[in-house]
């Protein structure tokens, strides 16, 4: 069995893979702070926009490399953050339930990135808690 990284290197240009991993790392590194600050009404608007952009970019880049689990997870997170950023109510904040869920998503994405970089054969299984998408996304 061939590892994920080796498989990507065979199917895609090496520069493309390196760019993907570099950008994925940079975007993922900023997620936790952006997510936690969704609880602050002064940061909510800018952070929900930035999170939406990051999840969109991860999704798009992962589609190109046919990394389906990453595409699916980032697409769900993009949809949720799309709902967040479209709420223009003054003083609105994200619910604790949503913040906890987004932190799980960020951990899962970091795990996927680690799996690729460590040349694992498969991407890890999805944390089952992620399946329970929060009903209440606003506080």
Residue ranges and their predicted role:
Residues 1-139:
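Non-catalytic helical tethers at domain boundaries
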């Amino acid at each position: 069995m061939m590892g994920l990284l080796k498989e990507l290197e065979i199917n895609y240009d090496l520069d493309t893979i390196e760019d993907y991993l570099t950008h994925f790392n940079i975007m993922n590194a900023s997620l936790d702070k952006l997510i936690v600050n969704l609880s602050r009404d002064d940061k909510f608007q800018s952070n929900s926009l930035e999170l939406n952009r990051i999840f969109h970019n991860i999704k798009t880049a992962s589609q190109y490399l046919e990394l389906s689990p990453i595409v699916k997870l980032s697409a769900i997170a993009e949809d949720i953050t799309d709902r967040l950023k479209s709420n223009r109510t003054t003083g609105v904040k994200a619910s604790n339930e949503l913040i906890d869920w987004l932190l799980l998503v960020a951990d899962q994405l970091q795990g996927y990135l680690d799996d690729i970089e460590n040349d694992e054969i498969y991407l890890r299984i999805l944390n089952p808690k992620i399946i329970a998408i929060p009903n209440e996304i606003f506080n």
